[in-house]
Regions:
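Feature captures the catalytic ectodomains and active-site-proximal regions of enzymes
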Residues: 1-512
Length: 512
């Protein structure tokens, strides 16, 4: 039988970077980590971008990191999944999108595309509009109208005109589509039940009511001239020969191409719910309505283009199915990460899964208490190791991330030192019972606290690699280079002498 327990230790926000300036990880006094990295198998792992299912070059985050670790496979985020489907051609065979096209052909009606027109990548991506336009062209659909919601929050405040110009150039190139209306996201993408705002966007879409302009760009420029930027552009209709270019009518098809649900729900309900009381809508305009993702299961009369796959056979589930006992330990700030996210978005604990929560300190900002609750978390970990009750323990130390977010270098250094002191105590306890441990991080943060270009404080996550260290395992094992977070569960499973389930597509990092 393998060593027991097997501990997965996650040092949240503990990235690795060569430069020492603004690098709390390098500036901190960390003799324990230095010794572990020198004496045990150690490699750098990837925790950002495509390696964790995010767009290339995008910094990792805690939710995505823990999801990938617990799943033992790369979990593609909506943005990446849709972009990938366009690139590999699956997009053009999407059932919901094809049904929307069929409806238009059958009724000789129009296809309306609506959503946030930018490359912000938070709610939508402009390249996805190009994908739908290309699909419409291939399907021989001529009446295609885009209703542009302007961003200015995830993009510069007056960049909307430029995005619409890019879109119009692309429509010309593909040979289909024209802009029919424009609205600031303040109106079209409200999420606080301010129905008076949503009503303005809806009336422009369906009734052609509101301000008018002879072209989308002219209307946006007129708004800029009045010092009203993208987010707040009052909904306007683009006219042709004095009338609205196009409005959404009975038997038309509508594709809402936002992939993030929270700000797409209200407008979708306005189109889809039979009984609607947000404002005086009148009868529902019956359309074939496609949401890019599932905005809300309770919304009626709609289809979903990209359905979220449920993540089966996560590491926690696998342990439970094999009758093994596991503990999850974290302080409040990262408790959801080692439970809900690590379990693939499932709230209920697995059979034999104990959860140990330590309260995070109540301070305004964590630079005021950089050690946070690390010592208490460490005590719980040492207790769990010594109890010999658990086959697997998953533990998260929040400090490098939470204190890193404050951008206060002195505090971040203290945070790193506190955590590394805890690592030392855990290693001692582990050796006493002859257990084994894999140390890693979910993404970087504390190793970069200064923006290299501006010299200003840098408080975000990073794209830097993270440490992978194998402690007190079979000395015949080494770790391979080039691994990512999805490879961790398969590694632990091999360490425990078990067979990796088929659903896990990550690859063990162990080499003999």
């Amino acid at each position: 039988m393998s060593k027991k327990p097997t501990v997965l230790m996650i040092l949240d926000g503990y990235g690795l970077r060569d430069k020492t300036e603004g690098n709390a990880v390098a500036l901190a006094n960390t003799p324990v980590m230095d010794k572990l990295m020198a004496e045990y198998p150690f490699v750098k792992g990837n925790a950002s971008g495509l390696s964790v299912g995010l767009p290339d070059g995008q910094m990792g985050n805690s939710e995505v990191g823990h999801m990938n670790m617990g799943a033992g496979r790369i979990i593609y985020q909506e943005l990446t999944k849709i972009t990938k489907s366009i690139e590999d051609g699956d997009f053009f065979e999407n059932k919901a999108l094809l049904a929307a096209c069929e409806n238009v052909k059958k009724n000789d009606s129009a296809l309306h595309l609506m959503g946030l027109v930018s490359d912000g990548g938070v709610h939508s991506h402009i390249t996805h509009i190009y994908g739908i336009l290309e699909l419409a062209k291939r399907q021989g659909i001529e009446k295609v109208y885009v209703h542009c919601f302007l961003d200015g929050r995830d993009t510069p405040p007056a960049s909307g005109k430029e995005y619409v110009e890019q879109l119009e150039a692309k429509m010309k190139e593909i040979g289909v589509g024209e802009v029919a209306s424009v609205s600031g996201r303040y109106y079209a993408m409200d999420r606080d039940n301010r129905w008076d705002r949503v009503e303005k966007a809806y009336k422009a879409l369906v009734a052609g009511e509101g301000n008018t302009a002879e072209s989308a760009t002219a209307g946006i420029q007129a708004s800029y001239d009045e010092d009203v930027t993208d987010e707040f552009v009052v909904p306007f209709v683009v006219t042709k020969d004095g009338a609205a270019t196009a409005t959404v009518k009975e038997n038309d098809s509508v594709v809402f191409f936002n992939f993030r649900p929270d700000r797409a729900r209200e407008l979708t309900r306005t189109f889809c719910d039979d009984s609607f009381d947000g404002f005086e809508r009148g009868d529902r305009v019956k359309t074939t309505f496609v949401c890019f993702t599932e905005y809300d299961a309770t919304i009626e009369n709609k289809t979903v283009a990209f359905v979220k796959e449920s993540i089966t056979n996560t590491f926690g589930q696998f342990l439970a199915d094999n009758g093994l006992k596991q503990a999850r330990i974290a302080e409040t700030e990262k408790y959801a990460h080692v439970t809900f996210f690590f379990n693939g978005g499932v709230e209920e604990p697995n059979e034999g899964e104990d959860r140990i929560l330590v309260k995070s300190p109540k301070v305004a900002t964590y630079d005021l208490k950089p050690e946070m609750s690390a010592y208490e978390v460490c005590d719980k970990l040492v207790g769990a190791i010594k109890s010999e009750n658990y086959d697997v323990i998953v533990i998260n130390f929040a400090n490098p991330d939470m204190v890193g977010h404050t951008g206060v270098q002195e505090a971040a250094i203290k945070a790193v030192e506190a955590v590394v002191e805890c690592v030392g105590k855990a290693v001692e306890a582990l050796k006493d019972v002859d257990g084994q441990m894999f140390i890693c991080a979910d993404h970087g943060n504390a190793e970069q606290l200064i923006d290299e270009e501006t010299g200003e404080p840098f408080t975000a996550h990073t794209t830097n690699p993270v440490p992978f260290i194998l402690v007190n395992a079979d000395p015949a094992y080494k770790l391979r280079e080039g691994g990512c977070l999805a490879d961790i569960a398969p590694t632990l499973i091999e360490l425990m002498g078990m067979q990796q389930p088929a659903e896990m597509t990550g690859k063990s990092l162990l080499v003999k």
